[in-house]
Amino acid sequence: MGSVTPIPLPKIDEPEEYNTNYILFWNHVGLELNRVTHTVGGPLTGPPLSARALGMLHLAIHDAYFSICPPTDFTTFLSPDTENAAYRLPSPNGANDARQAVAGAALKMLSSLYMKPVEQPNPNPGANISDNAYAQLGLVLDRSVLEAPGGVDRESASFMFGEDVADVFFALLNDPRGASQEGYHPTPGRYKFDDEPTHPVVLIPVDPNNPNGPKMPFRQYHAPFYGKTTKRFATQSEHFLADPPGLRSNADETAEYDDAVRVAIAMGGAQALNSTKRSPWQTAQGLYWAYDGSNLIGTPPRFYNQIVRRIAVTYKKEEDLANSEVNNADFARLFALVDVACTDAGIFSWKEKWEFEFWRPLSGVRDDGRPDHGDPFWLTLGAPATNTNDIPFKPPFPAYPSGHATFGGAVFQMVRRYYNGRVGTWKDDEPDNIAIDMMISEELNGVNRDLRQPYDPTAPIEDQPGIVRTRIVRHFDSAWELMFENAISRIFLGVHWRFDAAAARDILIPTTTKDVYAVDNNGATVFQNVEDIRYTTRGTREDPEGLFPIGGVPLGIEIADEIFNNGLKPTPPEIQPMPQETPVQKPVGQQPVKGMWEEEQAPVVKEAP
């Protein structure tokens, strides 16, 4: 194709000095690719795969950096002495420049992840991704070479060593098993996930290189086999959740489920409905954390990294941001821990989502069938389709647990473990004092908007007519608060039940009636003060039997704690999922529309966890 004009990207609301640090710079490049790939329909879209890309990037950066600047209190993820070649750290071969090693590792990893493969076993490679998408992603990488602090020396031994490190990680962890939806069909029945009533199908181009040509219908089910089949990164054991109310061992928990229905209607409904009791500030909280795969914004792992960037600079060890090796080491370790935890949180939350296939509130309330509980015409506030003229939507994957809650539980618990004893001291299950100021979400930055016409990728978003989202500047007192608000924000959008985040008794105010929780005079749910919250409640599970966490927050915390306690070690090969053919389910009832591709990528759609 001919010359390509870069998509105009709105400026990020953070100090420009952040990217004078080369660890933060390459993190920034990874985050730019996240928002661009979701804008152009490129590879690695959706929450779990976009988290995986950042995890692979920061493991490559971590080992490239610490091979040249060895730490005294931990080791690299790969080992130079292991007998298993798949986990062997390459020889430095004279590499002695950490800056160039990190550049080589980052550029090679990001190119391997986002550029069109030269060789691919699929007989129709890249069928779902346009040439323009790859070209736009290539422009981001080309620009990074020009803007990298200290420059890029591709011929140096250090740069080539970084490339070698990235190659080992890519071969080890680029595991596309389960990303395709081919062979999946929804399971019918009460409590079961199904097509979204407001977006039952999307119309996609038959030829991705001809977006204005013929269209075909496509039903979206994002990565149904991913959690059970893909390689984990650094967890050392299995992680399970309790059964949700209404299913299996908790089939008799009708009071808990019925009260959750009431909360969903009151707190997650569309703004115009009389039954909606959510406050304007709670509506803002729902939008603030969204990052639902929208144009120019991307997915939640991008926002979590933006927050961690601000935390990292706020609590840096030395004042010199650009040149301090102490800060470089600090950031390289922090982002590897955070993004590996985020990756494994995505794997285990997707494993449990598709294990239970629990319906979303939009389906649950509309299909309830009981006149005194459900509403067949109910609408949610919904996941925002920011920078489009589309209506809000229900994510195309099951509810329990919340991906947001699991990702946030893992990310912010890892931050809490990393800074404990440095910013202050706290127990692992109680509030911290990691406060941050001036945190702005791109969902509410005074720039991004709800458009009145289709998005134009050739024009700056500032020049496109629509309702501009108000710029809201936030302060948070702790990572404990970040973790909690991120989780409950999904209740306010109506895309999640309260138990998708955490057990009701851990976050709500009990009443004298079992499994019924307090409301204010307006009928809105009353949440506990964040400093009083502890995620301690456990519930039963049919298989395996036992007591397990309820919801995404404690699942994410559990994953982060395990990774941190074990010092960021690889998941042992013997406990990785066994290679298997993608399961094929026989359709029940109406034959679903065929998937639009059979490729090693998740569907390129707008999605929310």
From Swiss-Prot:
Protein name (record): Vanadium chloroperoxidase
Assembly information from the UniProt record: Homotetramer.
Any one GO cellular component localisation term in the record: extracellular region
Residue ranges of coiled coil: none
Post-translational modification: The N-terminus is blocked.
Subcellular localization, as worded in the UniProt entry: Secreted
CC cofactor: vanadate
Main location: secreted
Its biological purpose: Catalyzes the oxidation of chloride in the presence of hydrogen peroxide to hypochlorous acid (ClOH), which in turn can react with a nucleophilic acceptor (RH), to form a chlorinated compound.
Pfam families, sorted: VCPO_N (PF17897)
Catalytic reactions on record: RH + Cl(-) + H2O2 = RCl + 2 H2O
Domain of life of the native organism: Eukaryota
E.C. numbers: 1.11.1.10
Keyword Secreted tagged: yes
Region spans: Disordered: 569-609
KW Metal-binding (keyword) present: yes
SUPFAM superfamilies: Acid phosphatase/Vanadium-dependent haloperoxidase
Alphabetized UniProt keyword annotations: Chloride, Metal-binding, Oxidoreductase, Peroxidase, Secreted, Vanadium
Family membership: Belongs to the vanadium-dependent haloperoxidase family.
GO molecular function, one term: metal ion binding
